[in-house]
Amino acid sequence: PSASFHPRPTAVGGATSCTNVAHLRLVDTNVLVYRFDPRDPVKQRRATVLLEAGLQERTLRLAHQSIVEFVAVTTRPLKDLGGRTLMTVDEALFEAENLLRQWDVIYPTREVLSTAMRGMSHYRLPWFDAQIWAIAEVFGLRELLSEDFQHGRHYGRVRAVDPFLDTPGVHELPALY
């Protein structure tokens, strides 16, 4: 059985313009994967609650890259699961279709790629992390929900937030422009 969310009343196709983005946040791949990963029930619950609320409130966005990575990660054999995968290929593709149907997905542009190169150099981000950050930076999303960045740090105009930390409040770090 699918762990999909209930479809929203109106689907949005293609890229979003991201107007009025002050309250919008970008979700990294790890949040999507934890929703289907039984190895950490606490993170699984947090990811589910976060995604359900974001879908209902329409405050979260996905990068096209996160959907691609989601399929790759959930179908990769894992040593600690005895070589099993989190999902079969068919299950992962079904969930990827649900993500495309239910969420506003942002696609890369030339500006995103140029910004990612700058982020890779300036912040010493790995290439794929730089691309996720660049989507948020270029499209004006103020927060990036991910455990792969330094929690509370500003990368340009984007603040990284680790939704899986057990710390009360948000600890802000100064912007490093």
What residues fall within each predicted segment?
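Active-site neighborhoods of divalent-metal-dependent phosphate/nucleic-acid chemistry enzymes
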Residues: G13, T19-N20, Q102-L145
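Acidic active-site catalytic centers that drive phospho-/nucleotidyl reactions
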Residues: D28-N30, E69, D129, D148
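Amphipathic alpha-helical interaction segments
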Residues: V49, Q65, E69-A72, F94, ...
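Short beta-strand segments at enzyme active-site cores
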Residues: R61-Q65, L145-S146
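Helix-adjacent hinge/juxtasegments
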Residues: T74-P108
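Short acidic, glycine/proline-enriched helix-loop-strand junctions
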Residues: E95-N98, Q102-R110, S114, H151-Y177
